[in-house]
């Protein structure tokens, strides 16, 4: 039986991957009077006088909403909000399993930015954080930006920023292994969608100075009328040499390739034209931009993918549970760049100098020290950057 059939049978058996479990006992009239009426009125009045006490008297301090509009679900595309529910439930299960964060799935039946923003804003007071999931670009950029402006809790689009943090960790360790400095490398990012743009911005914040982005139609250049507004913004801050041409042209002499695009677009021959001992991160799923075996044939010193059946899996589960755990622990009002940078460095540091090798630059997803290390680093960065409230 293949994994698809096994998953279908498991989901039918489970009848959902999450449930609500009471933290209080309701076994007597006294329990009832404390848990509900009349006793519940007292914390209500306290919160009325001081809304911040909602973090003390309710589960808000540990509760995250996982929200989608169903327009970019995994590799399935626009399948609608209800069809995206199994993914949202799965994400909630990962939050609980890895970081003891209580998460709740919400599937919003709208593609209107104003409606989505208003809906999330209105319910945000029930949660300690918002995790946006599987929302198509470029709409996802505006939704996140506007929510950050109107909500006083962290809003985090994991498809963008969780990916970016993990890519940052992979780059730090690949550079550590190959003896390169982040600010001296030449990088190519293939793709210019939500994840690719977020990764590029974050790696620039990390210190990378020389990045060229490539889309289906070729190298991303300022002034190209085929670019959407988000891509135009990236064209202004990348491609310092104002190159034109194809992916094959872009990778010549490059130290690093990051792919968030399409299957089998990079060849071993292209890799052979890159700088000595190049680093190749082919993250398209399930079929990467180049298979690791072919990348190594082309001379790649380090290869990473999004797949669990190859070494160096770049998996968001290394990032988002710990990031939210750290943010919730200090009641952060935002998840900012400093916190994401701290997360990337913490993930990278979970691989010691003794452990680091070409087949092991990323810690394993089930390494228990990862989530705690990330959470502690994120919490400290929140304090240092002024967004922590406790």
Predicted features along the sequence, with ranges:
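N-terminal ligand-binding/catalytic initiation module
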Residues: 1-155, 375, 380-381, 385-389
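Solvent-exposed alpha-helices and their adjacent loops that cap or buttress functional pockets
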Residues: 12, 55-60, 96-97, 122-124, ...
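Short, ordered loop/turn segments at secondary-structure junctions
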Residues: 69-71, 79, 108-109, 134-137, ...
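Glycine-rich phosphate/diphosphate-binding loop of Rossmann-like nucleotide-binding domains
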Residues: 74, 79-99, 151, 157, ...
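General beta-strand structural signal in soluble alpha/beta enzymes
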Residues: 105, 131-134, 155-158, 189, ...
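Adenosine-phosphate binding glycine-rich loop
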Residues: 158-159, 178-180, 282-390
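Rossmann-like adenosine-cofactor binding region
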Residues: 232-301, 307-309
């Amino acid at each position: 039986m293949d994994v698809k059939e096994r998953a279908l049978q498991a989901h039918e058996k489970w009848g959902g991957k999450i449930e609500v479990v009471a933290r209080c006992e309701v076994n007597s009239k006294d329990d009832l009077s404390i848990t509900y009426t009349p006793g519940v009125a007292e914390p209500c009045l306290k919160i009325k006088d001081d809304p911040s006490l909602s973090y003390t008297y309710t589960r808000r301090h540990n509760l995250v909403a996982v929200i989608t509009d169903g327009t970019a679900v995994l590799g399935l595309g626009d399948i609608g909000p209800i069809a995206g529910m199994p993914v949202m439930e799965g994400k909630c299960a990962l939050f609980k399993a890895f970081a003891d964060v209580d998460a709740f799935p919400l599937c919003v039946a709208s593609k209107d930015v104003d409606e989505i923003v208003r809906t999330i804003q209105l319910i945000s007071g029930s949660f300690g954080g918002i995790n946006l999931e599987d929302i198509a670009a470029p709409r996802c950029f505006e939704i996140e930006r506007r929510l950050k402006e109107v909500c006083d809790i962290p809003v985090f689009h994991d498809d963008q920023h969780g990916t970016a943090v993990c890519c940052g960790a992979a780059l730090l360790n690949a550079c550590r292994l190959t003896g390169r400095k982040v600010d001296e490398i030449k990088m190519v990012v293939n793709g210019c969608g939500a994840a690719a743009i977020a990764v590029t911005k974050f790696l620039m914040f990390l210190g990378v100075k020389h990045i060229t982005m490539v889309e289906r139609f070729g190298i991303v250049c300022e002034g190209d009328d085929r670019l959407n507004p988000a891509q135009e913004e990236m064209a202004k801050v990348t491609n310092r040499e104002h190159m034109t041409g194809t992916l094959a042209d872009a990778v010549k002499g490059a130290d690093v390739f990051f792919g968030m695009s399409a299957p089998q677009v990079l060849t071993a021959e292209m890799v052979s034209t890159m700088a000595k001992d190049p680093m190749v991160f082919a993250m398209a799923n399930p079929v990467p931009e180049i298979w690791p075996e072919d990348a190594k044939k082309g001379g790649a010193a380090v290869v990473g993918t999004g797949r669990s059946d190859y070494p160096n899996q770049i998996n968001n589960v290394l990032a988002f549970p710990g990031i939210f755990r750290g943010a919730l622990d200090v009641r952060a009002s935002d998840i900012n760049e400093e916190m994401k940078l701290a997360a990337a460095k913490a993930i990278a540091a979970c691989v010691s100098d003794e452990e680091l090798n070409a087949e092991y630059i990323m810690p394993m997803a089930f390494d228990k020290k990862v989530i705690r290390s990330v959470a502690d680093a994120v919490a400290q960065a929140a304090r240092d950057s002024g967004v922590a409230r406790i």
